[in-house]
Amino acid sequence: MSAMDSLVARAEAISSDAERVTEAKLRKVTLPLGAGVLGLITLDNGEDHTKPNTFGPRGLLSLNAAIDAALADDEVTALGITGKPFILAAGADLTSIAGGGPDAVRTVAELGHAVFRKLGEGGKPSFGFVNGLALGGGLEVALHCDYRTVMDSAPALGLPEVMLGLIPGWGGAWLVPNLVGADKAVTLILENPLSQGRTLGGQAAFALGLADACFSGADYLEQSMLWAAGVLTGSVTVDRPEVDRGEAWDAALARAEEIVASKTGGASPAARRAVELVAAARTADLDAGFAAEDQALDDMSK
């Protein structure tokens, strides 16, 4: 049995009817500009906007199957992921995970990493289309993609985990500092959650560097797919600033310590662990960074 097969079996063993399952629905879309066929995955739990998409064991397994199907389809040249109207996803389904037994947190942490990273490592270009609310794992799933667009009117993007006594556990603590630098990561992972759960709107998230393009809501998905076609054909170039791993990283960690001291009095193990993860992301590779997130969540669940 492969490591992934074993992980899937563990996830199936802790699945329960308590989960409001977010299904990952795959359809093929012919892109403009002769860019090929996009395997577009839409996350949808079948509820209205008052009940956001979330990821429990079954939802992650549904996404895993959709990604695998898109990667295995020779007609599909690129992958995209978006959500039901105005919602990408609101992170983990904590209620369903809570009833899964002592190893549930570790299992779901590892499964989320294993599934999400296929978006960036599957061998086909991937696009995260952030069409609305994206919190915690809902933002992290987009961060795993090679490219991202965001709707300008998206109401709430962020990594609120520290406010909940957790850490960004599906890649965020490593991906964000390595994408936008440590200082912006400290803002997203520590300062905002500890400032009464502050989040970003779509335009602010774009300005922070979390997305490569920002489009209006009226025809957001169409504009995003046209932009993706441009990336694939080479008519659109994505430039990202180089991450400063020197003094700027040191300064960011010093600011993180000040935030933790002023906001929590040093009494938040989650905030303390988040600082350690951002510090480690400076030199850790992706595997080590994700393993550290798994371990942190496992430790905090005991």
Please name every model-derived segment.
Residues M1-T42, K184-D299:
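Amphipathic alpha-helical segments at domain termini/boundaries
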Residues G36-D44, L60-D103, A114-N131, M151-A156:
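A structural preference for short, pocket-lining loop segments at secondary-structure junctions
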Residues L43-E47, G101, E161, G209, ...:
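Short, histidine-centered active-site or binding-site loop motifs used for metal coordination
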Residues N45-T50, T95-I97, A280-A281:
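A short, flexible beta-alpha/helix-coil linker loop
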Residues I67, D298-K302:
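Long amphipathic alpha-helix in the N-terminal Rossmann-like dinucleotide-binding domain
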Residues P102-D239:
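Conserved catalytic cores of soluble enzyme domains
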